[in-house]
């Protein structure tokens, strides 16, 4: 189930994004990016619709994923 990111308080959204970024551990190439930069990137992706917040009833968790990978 999609969760509209706009419905979350700014603090909750920030915490969800930080948790996601810390879990992912993605390699950003030659130059390491700060947590703040990574959070900003994910927030931008949510705002422009490239990424979505998804609630998993099965796992009772919230995740962030590319819109193209989301299947209802």
UniProtKB/Swiss-Prot annotation:
InterPro entries in UniProt: UPF0270 (IPR010648), YehU-like_sf (IPR036685)
Entry's family note: Belongs to the UPF0270 family.
Protein name as it appears in the record: UPF0270 protein YheU
């Amino acid at each position: 189930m999609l969760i509209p990111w706009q419905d979350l308080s700014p603090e909750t959204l920030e915490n969800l994004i930080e948790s996601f970024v810390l879990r992912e551990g993605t390699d950003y190439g030659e130059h390491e990016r700060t947590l703040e930069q990574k959070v900003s990137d994910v927030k931008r992706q949510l705002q422009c619709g490239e990424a979505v917040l998804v609630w998993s009833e099965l796992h009772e968790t919230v995740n962030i994923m590319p819109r193209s990978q989301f299947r209802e």
